[in-house]
């Protein structure tokens, strides 16, 4: 168990919106702050700065966890406006300060996530990276090994191992009675000589339950209408397209991911269709869904 310190952002602060929330997701971030001393306590102080506009629920370092918001209130951390990332997910920042132990901070975050999943009946499939909501490359230190990170939460049946100094993929494979090829497949490792200390590896076959669809896609047809169609199903299409670099409005707030199927989203769909051999009509339907899913798999 890791010590959790409640240090809430003051009521009425700009970054404590106070909207009621029933958590359906857990969103994982890295702080992207490598400064010495940039631990959980430092981020708690930062969130109380009157000029700070963002907020999240927990910051985790290698020794402790700070809670900044009650879990029945939302924060501004996911970059999707009033979408489910901000309004229905618990935001967790993992510290990467130079004087901390990132592997231990990651393990502490996994423990916290497992605890929150049990308390709020949140499935492992609904533990998502910040990138899921807005396309931002976050958590930057975990995206390449996201499946391993989730397996380490303990929501499934896979065994995991943290790479130590002197380990090789061959020695790890031998220790767990598996092959190097299996370790490469389970952990998306192209070069077996490139593993790093602190990396979390899956060392037994992942179950299907541990491989949730990162970018779920809606069924049916979505097209330009008056008024514009909006909702979570549009967010899903926009996030998936952004993951393939077909942004609704690159450079705009959240790259145009706003949950509204307007002309710019229809254009992103048409651009995707054009380069994938489909009729470029800007209408999302079964054929477009199939192509997007294939590109993401």
Swiss-Prot record:
Range of residues in the leader sequence: 1-44
Source superkingdom: Bacteria
Annotated ranges, domain LysM: 159-203
Statement: the UniProt record of this protein carries the keyword Nucleus: no
GO annotation terms (biological process): cell wall organization; establishment of competence for transformation; peptidoglycan catabolic process; peptidoglycan turnover; sporulation resulting in formation of a cellular spore
Pfam families cross-referenced by the UniProt entry: Amidase_2 (PF01510), LysM (PF01476), PG_binding_1 (PF01471)
A GO MF term: N-acetylmuramoyl-L-alanine amidase activity
Disulphide-bridged cysteine pairs: none
InterPro entries: Amidase/PGRP_sf, Amidase_domain, LysM_dom, LysM_dom_sf, NAMLAA_amidase_2, Peptidoglycan-bd-like, PGBD-like_sf, PGBDSf
Keyword line: Cell wall biogenesis/degradation, Competence, Hydrolase, Secreted, Signal, Sporulation
Predominant place of localization: secreted
Protein location: Secreted
Domain N-acetylmuramoyl-L-alanine amidase positions: 45-140
Protein family (similarity comment): Belongs to the N-acetylmuramoyl-L-alanine amidase 2 family.
Alphabetized PANTHER family for the sequence: N-ACETYLMURAMOYL-L-ALANINE AMIDASE AMID, N-ACETYLMURAMOYL-L-ALANINE AMIDASE XLYA
Function: Autolysins are involved in some important biological processes such as cell separation, cell-wall turnover, competence for genetic transformation, formation of the flagella and sporulation.
Name recorded for this polypeptide: N-acetylmuramoyl-L-alanine amidase XlyA
Gene: xlyA
């Amino acid at each position: 168990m890791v010590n959790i310190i409640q240090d809430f952002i003051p009521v009425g602060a700009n970054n404590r919106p106070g909207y009621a929330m029933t958590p359906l997701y857990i969103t994982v971030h890295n702080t992207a702050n490598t400064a010495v001393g940039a631990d959980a306590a430092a981020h708690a102080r930062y969130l109380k700065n009157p000029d700070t506009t963002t907020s999240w629920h927990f910051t985790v370092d290698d020794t402790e966890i700070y809670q900044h918001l009650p879990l029945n209130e939302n924060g501004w951390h996911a970059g999707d406006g009033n979408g489910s990332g901000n309004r229905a997910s618990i935001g967790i920042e993992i510290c990467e300060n130079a004087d901390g132990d990132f592997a231990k901070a990651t393990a502490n975050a996994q423990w916290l996530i497992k605890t929150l999943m049990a308390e709020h009946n949140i499935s492992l499939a609904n533990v998502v990276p910040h990138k899921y909501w807005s396309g931002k490359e976050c958590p930057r230190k975990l995206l390449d090994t996201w499946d391993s990170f989730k397996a380490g939460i303990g929501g499934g049946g896979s065994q995991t191992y943290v790479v130590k100094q002197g380990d090789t993929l061959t020695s790890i494979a031998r220790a767990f009675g598996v092959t190097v090829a299996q370790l490469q497949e389970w952990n998306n490792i192209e070069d077996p000589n490139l593993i790093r200390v602190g990396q979390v590896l899956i060392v037994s076959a992942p179950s299907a339950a541990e491989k949730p669809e990162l970018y779920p896609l809606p069924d049916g047809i979505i097209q330009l209408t008056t008024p514009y169609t909006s909702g979570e199903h549009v967010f899903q299409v926009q996030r998936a397209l952004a993951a393939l670099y077909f942004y609704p409005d690159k450079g705009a707030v959240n790259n145009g991911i706003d949950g509204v199927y307007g002309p710019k989203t229809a254009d992103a769909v048409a651009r995707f269709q054009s380069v994938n051999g489909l009729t470029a009509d800007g209408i999302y339907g079964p054929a477009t869904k199939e192509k997007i899913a294939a590109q993401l798999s």
